[in-house]
UniProtKB/Swiss-Prot annotation:
One GO cellular component, as annotated: plasma membrane
Identification of the protein by name: Ion-translocating oxidoreductase complex subunit D
Origin species: Halorhodospira halophila (strain DSM 244 / SL1) (Ectothiorhodospira halophila (strain DSM 244 / SL1))
One of the GO biological process terms: transmembrane transport
Xref: InterPro entries: NqrB/RnfD, RnfD_bac
Taxonomic lineage: Bacteria, Pseudomonadati, Pseudomonadota, Gammaproteobacteria, Chromatiales
Keywords, sorted A to Z: Cell inner membrane, Cell membrane, Electron transport, Flavoprotein, FMN, Membrane, Phosphoprotein, Translocase, Transmembrane, Transmembrane helix, Transport
EC number: 7.-.-.-
């Protein structure tokens, strides 16, 4: 008679709330730097977005008949709102944060059934929808105005910027590095002549340049990503393959024609490349489950980013790239499957014959 034994199982070392809080902890330094760099309006936008996602998540949980306290306690909505706020223009009006927060929770999560059921990254769903619906507000980049500096708006002035839009935009806005490269290509100019004014590697590494609220500091984002890998919150394959693929593509084409194609440093340090590689594309719900699948997913993201930045109508492409590859995740998981316990990688059952003593 066969002996009944329990099936093999294991328990994850980190719970969902713990994982989400680790992500928030890793994103906090880059976010704090962005708030310092762009002043009170950036903090206003961050808080508005976070409050909106929490209220929207509570409403969705109540409508679905699920416990509100435990649903909010997993911090998944907070992470979605935080990542969304990091990717928004720092002086965007209050309603951008409200609409974006609602889209992230309702359209990005709620319609799919809630946490763990969504096909697309909620923050990027909101960001792309906002970019399509409100292109002016979503592409208005301000020059750095650090807190405490002579050019920084005071607290009361920041309320006017956030809630009434009373800012002299021509005096405070500037072009991002990717905007400058895109404009140069469109006007038939050489990228090599346009970049020195818009791109300085040292400043790009620190994040002292026009851009989204917390996408600029390459150094802090990379440190946060390394921390998440060390804590085993994210898999290393996605950021490693995504950054390597993008660097190889950029290097090859820049070598062929440096006047037409930006180099790897521009593609890696400018825009939201590092934010996407470490904090967005690594979302376990919307990325493949296998090591090979994650590598394919990351390479696809990198190729789309490079193609759209180089030939497309948008200078920044990470949100589009992540959403497109999110759509391919079920197909990747279908064709690239993990080995089933008790079977070979080809699917044949493992032999159960045992040699006698």
């Amino acid at each position: 008679m066969s002996e009944l034994v329990a099936g093999p199982h294991t328990r994850a070392p980190l719970s969902l709330p713990t994982l989400m809080r680790q992500v928030l902890l890793a994103a906090a330094p880059a976010t704090a730097f962005g708030v310092w760099l762009y002043g009170w309006p950036a903090l206003n936008l961050l808080l508005i977005t976070l409050v909106t996602v929490l209220v929207a998540e509570a409403a969705c949980l109540r409508a679905a008949g699920r416990p509100v306290r435990s649903g909010l306690g997993d911090s998944s909505a907070l992470v979605a709102g935080w990542i969304l706020a990091m990717s928004l223009p720092p002086w965007a009006p209050w309603w951008i944060g409200v609409i974006g927060g609602l889209l992230a929770v309702v359209l990005g999560k709620g319609v799919f059934g809630g946490t763990g059921q969504n096909l697309f990254n909620p923050a990027m769903v909101a960001r792309v929808a906002l970019l399509i619906a409100f292109p002016v507000e979503m592409t208005r980049w301000v020059e750095p105005a650090p807190l405490g500096s002579a050019v920084a708006p005071g607290f009361l002035e920041s309320l006017g910027i956030t809630f009434t839009g009373t800012a002299d935009w021509d005096a405070v806005t500037g072009a991002t590095t990717l905007d400058a490269t895109r404009t140069a290509v469109t006007e038939g100019q050489s990228i090599e002549t346009a970049l020195p004014e818009a791109y300085q590697p040292a400043l790009a590494l620190l994040g002292y340049a026009p851009g989204s609220l917390a996408e600029g500091s390459a150094l802090l984002l990379a440190l946060g990503g390394v921390y998440l890998i060390y804590r085993r919150v994210i898999a290393w394959e996605i950021p490693a393959v995504m950054l390597a693929t993008l660097a190889v593509l950029a290097t090859v084409f820049h070598t062929l024609d440096p006047t037409r194609y930006a180099d790897a440093g521009v593609h890696i340090l400018a825009g939201s490349t590092l934010l996407a590689a470490f904090f967005i594309a690594t979302d376990p719900t919307t990325s493949p489950t296998t090591t090979v699948g994650r590598a394919v997913f990351a390479a696809g993201c990198a190729v789309i980013v490079w193609v759209v930045r180089t030939y497309g109508g948008y200078p920044e492409a990470t949100a589009f790239a992540v959403l497109l590859m999110n759509a391919f995740t079920p197909l990747i998981d279908h064709w690239i499957r993990p080995r089933v316990y008790g079977r070979t990688r080809l699917g044949a059952p493992l032999s159960t014959d045992r040699e006698g003593p």
